Amino acid sequence: MTSFQSTLDDDEDGIAEELAASQREISVAEFFEKNKHMLGFDSGARGLVTAVKEAVDNALDATEEAGILPDIYVEISEGRDYYTLIVEDNGPGITNAQIPKIFGKLLYGSRFHAREQSRGQQGIGISAAVLYSQLTSGKPVRIESRTQDSETANVYELIIDTDTNEPEISAETEVSAAKSDLRGTHGTRIEMALDANMRARGQLHDYIKHTAVVNPHARIELQEPGGELKSERAEEASLPAETDEILPHPHGVELGTLIKMLAETDSHSVSGFLQSEFTRVGSKTATGIIDAFRDEHFGREMRWRPPADADLEATVADAVANKDATHTAVFARTVADAVRDADSIAPAELGALVADAAADAQDDTGTSFGETVQANVVAAVRDALTSDRVADVLGPVDEATTVQKDDATVRGLAERIAAKFESGGDTDRVTRDTLDEYVFRAAENTAEYADATIGETARENVADALWARMATVPDDPPNTSALADDRDAASDLLAAMASVNVMAPPTSCLSPIEADQLEAGLRTEFDADFYAAATRDADVHGGDPFIVEAGIAYGGDIDSEGGVQLMRFANRVPLVYQRGACATTDVLGDIGWRNYNLSQPGGSGLPQGPAVIMVHVASTNVPFTSESKDAIANVPEIEAEIELAVREAARELKSFLQKRQSMRKRQQKQDVIMDILPTMAEKVGELTGRGGVDVSDSLARIMNNVLVERARSDDGQTVTLRVENHGTGSVDVDVTDIVSAEPDGVGDDASVVAMDDEYFVKWTPAVAGDDAAELTYSVDADADCELSVSGVADARLTVSEADT
């Protein structure tokens, strides 16, 4: 084999030119043409599901943005060589000029730069489906769209030119409403041929069904070979709340993005930039960030205390030349008093203090103490302040170290740190990194010469104590253009933004489903015995707000074999693939479901039983594991909220199951008593000669039940309804007596409704524990009566009907 290096040695320039000639730019369409699996088009079965998903997501977004309740029609038909997919919506339609770009150009969309919740963002989805269609069938897709109030529809047939990532239009026509294939007066219809199969029918049905759960305001119809699937709109369902676009959050930007923003902003000052380009940043927060930037970029200055025996007035007077002695004394006294009042003071603070004292002295004496005098005074006072650095450093060092450190070790450490400051310059200004280095070197030297150990924790505590003692400098930060050209300075600004507490982003950019709508969606798609839903408060990850919602349906017609059904969603879009790679699955598997009365073999993993568990993550930036957006990444903040939301719904399930178990045991006990009590009553009747005895009253008392009984007078014309509560808590009982003749004399606390020659006497008494309520009315003796009772669990209810 010929050595590549030897070839280069023979003709380096020629090879370089040859290699350079082979290099060329590739378009994004060409890239995804060769890597379509990255977008979820890795097989015919999955490709069909992904194409349906992208088209339906587009339809939902279009209708919702126009304020239209979505009606979406999906049709899949099998041809001789290919499958045909048709997706139609009742949205506002697309303008003629935009149709080719939306469907024939990858990375073309309106949401990429918008920080608000949306199903799609990159502008890849539907155009990727078009690309997959042309790659597998070689046919153009057909798009027909009609805008509101338009008399005609625009029809395009196109493919994507993968070399240029531009639409290649093969046909363009305008048709009248009568000749349009659209079923409504406005909307969009896309028809594509693709190499596919129905082996993923289950995932396709899951997608449609799950989409209906989190979009209860939508009506979706699927027509497929051999059947149909319809998801009707939930009653009283409304459109999701409109979202607002927000600015980026200071905690959510990266360095490159920050530099770009600095270069493009119209603001000159850093304060203006922060307040105009970021959310939740007002004047106070901007000041805090700028101070943190000063700490990062310029460092802090050490504060020193004047020695107790220092004669500051004399020090100031000696530094002033050629001024009236009396006036100088006034100036010196003003400076000395201010320094002592400050307790400890940094060089920059000292300069400001001396300037203020000079102004006050001039007002009092008329003598000017100019910049030269002030500089001399600052230098002289600073020398006095720093004459005993060790004493100033010793205090914080002693407080930060444990009592296990002997005095000699602590003093030795303080002396070495003070020496570092002494050699550091006139301003005693250091960054936090430099301060950490001071402490580290001093600790190493102390350990070496004093045979003492100063651990990492002690060093950090000492550095923290000294840093807290130091003063933020007043230096003005660079302007935005200077920061944009200085990567290190921009990095310092980014660190400052991250270090300051900033209020969480507003949640107006999010549109959660909300617990009541989520429960309505579950009720629409699942016939269960129990439903619960929970919507958490907003939280933040990486500067992006997010909300987690969870819902549970249990029992009823839900399959009880095997594991529970898990439904995962992100921004109202079902995630039907890569369940095992999703953070949602990981979190649910770590929950101890036995605590919630669900079976969980091995104590980990998804529980088993007749249940559906759904989790929805809504965010301006959902962190997916891949470009196909099939699974949510393991972000700790999101995982924590998923667990809390699911546990909130699961607690309601636990309460329901415990109550049902209690009712089941109660019913079993009642059944046993009912097997015994009639026999006992019969024997008692024989012994007493009183004949048969109604055991309903006795059963109600024994079981602490609610007894509802109806009795008629001997002539049959008076009906008495009586409710006795033998329990401890109050109950609201819905009693309905269905009568074949019109009743009379019904009290004000009841009502009569006539329907189809029958009369419904409706009575809803609230009966306290160990109390009773009674209702009496008149009726023809020949009238038939049928008693119906609700509002009380069957296991706690005893009903007795007597003709006389």
Curated annotation (Swiss-Prot):
One of its GO terms (molecular function) is DNA binding. Keywords: ATP-binding, DNA-binding, Isomerase, Nucleotide-binding, Topoisomerase. It comes from the Archaea. It catalyses: ATP-dependent breakage, passage and rejoining of double-stranded DNA. GO terms for biological process: DNA topological change. GO terms for cellular component: cytosol; small ribosomal subunit. ATP binds at N58, D89, S110, R111, G120, Q121, Q122, G123, I124, G125, I126, S127, K629. Its EC number is 5.6.2.2. Belongs to the TOP6B family. Relaxes both positive and negative superturns and exhibits a strong decatenase activity. Homodimer. Heterotetramer of two Top6A and two Top6B chains. This is Type 2 DNA topoisomerase 6 subunit B. The lineage of its organism: Archaea, Methanobacteriati, Methanobacteriota, Stenosarchaea group, Halobacteria.
